[in-house]
Swiss-Prot record:
Zinc finger boundaries on the chain: CCHC NOA-type: 389-419
Domain notes: The leucine-zipper domain and the CCHC NOA-type zinc-fingers constitute the UBAN region and are essential for polyubiquitin binding and for the activation of IRF3.
Species assigned in the record: Bos taurus (Bovine)
Official protein name in the record: NF-kappa-B essential modulator
A GO MF label: zinc ion binding
Length: 419
């Protein structure tokens, strides 16, 4: 069984005894502590006074031993109390206290050896004193270690508090950062939604513009086709007119040929303008494809869409101008057709009159004198009708009746006047 913790070998080193043998032992111990002359008297020579004195000395020694035992008990209890407190406070100090306990055990063994070897008691006591001093030094060192450990503990506690405060600050900063990240995420999602809506709107606007461009191209192709049909009709009309003019009148053919050449030049210019507009349309289509490629850059795409819209409006205005010019040319063509019809009618009338004159000449051939007069009478309307083509053509604005010197000036003036 394990002995109680408060009972150590140090407490059992010296126990007072009331027996004479115990007194003699204690007397022997006291004689070894400093009174050897009084204890080495033979027992057979002792007197009652000597015995009484020995008893008194024995009592004094017992008191001294009791006091020393009490002091040792107190020190042992103090050491045990200190050891228990240190064991409760710091577990790793058990090694030092274990060394002290081993030292106490060794001292108890030495005390037993002192009981067996009384002649070495003083040396053992001195060694005990030395051991006590060593224990005091160890105690001081242990106290210093405990003080340093307490300082380290306080420092670690202060560091722990600082780390706790820093952790709390970091947690608050992390919460703020997480809130800010959530806000930024929501803003980013809203911005992405707005950008996606803007991109969809721009895509729809681009598709509508492409559809309008396709419609404009279809309208341009339709107008070109109509213009080609008009040109074919014009060429046919011109051929008929040319044939008729060759058969009817040579001088009018030359003047009308010049006018038709001018009309051909106008038609050629209109065709060139159509080709140029077709090139512009192709260029706009390429720009639209480039706009599709650059769709990711929304601000640049928006600016390009504005430019594209302006170009589209300019193209529409140019097409409107071209349509007006085409209408003007068509009106001129209709006017030429009407003039051709009028000339054809006049030629037919003149031919009919000539036939009537010939028949009249054949019927009334004897009176020859009136013939030239009648011939001149019938030729005057023809000559009067032929005289206007001999005159230079008049380039007149149909809107403000401006007289232009040539066809180019008239075209420029008509475009400005229409605008």
């Amino acid at each position: 069984m394990s002995r109680p913790p408060w009972k150590s070998p140090l407490c059992e080193m010296v126990q007072p005894s009331g027996s004479p043998a115990g007194d003699q032992d204690m007397l022997g111990e006291e004689s070894s502590l400093g009174k050897p002359a009084m204890l080495h008297v033979p027992s057979e020579q002792g007197t009652p006074e000597t015995f009484q004195r020995c008893l008194e000395e024995n009592q004094e020694l017992r008191d001294a031993i009791r006091q020393s035992n009490q002091m040792l008990r107190e020190r042992c209890e103090e050491l045990q109390h200190f050891q228990g407190n240190q064991r409760e406070e710091k577990a790793f100090l058990m090694q030092k206290f274990q060394e002290a306990r081993d030292l106490v055990v060794r001292l108890s063994l030495e005390k037993r050896e002192l009981r067996q070897q009384r002649e070495q008691a003083l040396k053992e006591v001195e060694r005990l004193k030395t051991c006590q001093q060593q224990m005091a030094e160890d105690k001081a060192s242990v106290k210093a270690q405990v003080t340093s450990l307490l300082g380290e503990l306080q420092e670690s506690q202060s560091r722990l508090e600082a780390a706790t405060k820093e952790r709390q600050a970091l947690e608050s900063r992390a919460r703020v950062a997480s809130e800010k990240a959530r806000q930024l995420e929501s803003e980013r999602e809203a911005l992405e939604q707005r950008h996606s809506v803007q991109v969809d709107q721009l895509v729809l606007q681009n598709e509508s513009m492409e559809a309008a461009l396709r419609m404009e191209r279809q309208a341009a192709s339709e107008e070109k086709r109509k213009l080609a049909q008009l040109q074919v009709a014009y060429h046919q009309l011109f051929q008929e007119y040319d044939n008729h003019m060759k058969s009817s009148m040579v001088s009018s053919e030359r003047n009308r040929g010049l006018q038709l050449e001018d009309l051909k030049q106008q038609l050629q210019q209109a065709e060139e303008a159509l080709v140029a507009k077709q090139e512009v349309i192709d260029k706009l289509k390429e720009e639209a494809e480039q706009h599709k490629i650059v769709m990711e850059t929304v601000p640049v795409l928006k600016a390009q869409a504005d430019i594209y819209k302006a170009d589209f409006q300019a193209e529409r205005q140019a097409r409107e101008k071209l349509a007006e010019k085409k209408e003007f040319l068509q009106e001129q063509l209709e006017q030429l057709q009407r003039e051709y019809s009028r000339l054809k009618t006049s030629c037919q009338e003149s031919a009919r009159i000539e036939d009537m004159r010939k028949r009249h000449v054949e019927v009334s051939q004897p009176p020859l004198a009136p013939g030239p007069a009648h011939h001149s009478f019938h030729l005057n309307p023809s000559s009067q009708r032929r005289s206007p083509p001999d005159e230079p053509p008049k380039f007149c604005c149909p809107k403000c009746q401006y007289q232009a010197p040539d066809i180019d000036t008239l075209q420029i003036h008509v475009m400005e006047c229409i605008e």
